[in-house]
Curated annotation (Swiss-Prot):
This is Non-structural protein NS-S. It is found in: Host cytoplasm; Host cytoplasmic vesicle. Changing P102A: Complete loss of ability to induce TPL2 signaling and IL-10 production and drastically reduced pathogenesis. Complete loss of formation of NSs-induced inclusion bodies and secretion of IFN-beta. Stronger interaction with host ABIN2. Belongs to the Bandavirus NS-S protein family. The lineage of its organism: Viruses, Riboviria, Orthornavirae, Negarnaviricota, Polyploviricotina. Residues 21-29 are annotated as: Essential for inhibition of IFN-beta activation and interaction with host TBK1. Residues 66-69 are annotated as: Involved in inclusion bodies formation. Sequesters host STAT2 into viral inclusion bodies. Impairs IFN-stimulated phosphorylation and nuclear translocation of host STAT2, thereby suppressing type-I IFN antiviral signaling. Sequesters host TRIM25, RIGI, TBK1/IKK complex components (TBK1, IKBKE/IKKE, and IRF3) and IRF7 into viral inclusion bodies, thereby inhibiting the IFN responses. Inhibits TRIM25-mediated ubiquitination of the RIGI. The sequestration of IKBKE/IKKE, and IRF3 occurs via the interaction with TBK1. Sequestration and inhibition of host TBK1 probably participates to the cytokine storm induced by the virus.
């Protein structure tokens, strides 16, 4: 709870009855006024899962929970962090504008921290106090002052979850329980959208795809753009060189042809799942498939 909301709070009473938020690994427990906290068990993989129960987690992992499979970085995510690990001077003015969230000012702190802690796997700066964890949550909450540090931590998680929902990213990518990595990926999503692309891979559910399209950072899903008549289409072929500058031409060509169509054509399991009528009454049945497919 921020200072503006708790000016009349009896601090002595709160100190005796407050719940605590645990910051891992071994960074202490901090009081909070919230009463809806729940122990984050191994079966709880995302913040969204906790919130669907009407609760809030009491444990936050700065460097990811080693028991959470969604926090195990695959090569594709590490390549993403390596790609976007740059100095502020390397970004254009348009890109800096996309990096205003969460602090309100352009910053690459989270991108660099995620690269250090998750790609290089060097966490000594935070563990030894060289980097203060409070500064991390201070940035996410835009400098808001709190009486209790536990409230600052939980409000930061709420801000991350709100941003995830706004950008439409799946909870298996932004778990909400690993703030440094979550914010870095949300910033990468903002930068990717400047090129008309997205990290969103929730359509790709076939088990034959390993963490779909994230085995290589080049595989983004192209965002459709709105036409003057109100319909949507993928990026025009003429726009490819400008929008996908820096990407291999053949890969850019493949991406702009909407990879889902190619996958569903050749992956029988994915095609069966996509055409299952449980998704909606007007969903096409398998028997309605064109002969050429």
């Amino acid at each position: 709870m921020s200072l503006s909301k708790c000016s009349n709070v009896d601090l002595k009473s709160v100190a005796m009855n407050a719940n605590t938020v645990r910051l891992e690994p071994s960074l202490g427990e901090y009081p909070t006024l919230r009463r809806d906290l729940v122990e984050c068990s191994c079966s709880v993989l995302t913040l969204s899962m906790v919130k669907r129960m009407g609760k809030m987690t009491n444990t936050v992992w700065l460097f990811g929970n080693p028991k959470n499979p969604l926090h195990q970085l695959e090569p594709g995510l590490e390549q993403l962090l390596d790609m976007y690990y740059k100095d502020m001077r390397c970004y254009s003015q348009r890109e800096l504008s996309a990096l205003r969230w969460p602090s309100g000012k352009p910053s690459v702190w989270f991108l660099q921290a995620a690269h250090m802690f998750f790609s290089i796997k060097n966490s000594w700066a935070m563990e030894t106090g060289r980097e203060n964890w409070r500064g991390l949550f201070h940035r996410i909450t835009k400098g808001q002052k709190y009486l209790f540090e536990g409230d600052m931590i939980l409000d930061s998680l709420e801000a991350i979850e709100k941003r995830r929902l706004r950008l439409g990213l799946p909870e298996i990518l932004i778990t909400g329980l690993s703030p440094i990595l979550d914010v870095a990926l949300l910033q990468i999503e903002s930068l990717a959208r400047l090129r008309g692309m997205s990290l969103n891979h929730h359509l790709f559910t076939s088990p034959s795809l390993r963490k779909p399209l994230l085995d290589c950072w080049d595989f983004f899903i192209p965002v459709r753009k709105k036409k003057t008549d109100g319909s949507y289409s993928v990026l025009d072929e003429d726009d490819e060189p400008g929008v996908l500058h820096g990407y291999p031409h053949l890969m850019a060509h493949y991406l702009n042809r909407c990879p889902f169509h190619n996958l569903i054509r050749f992956d029988e399991e994915l095609r069966t799942a996509a055409l299952n009528t449980i998704w909606g009454r007007d969903w096409p049945a398998i028997g309605d498939l064109p002969k050429e497919v």
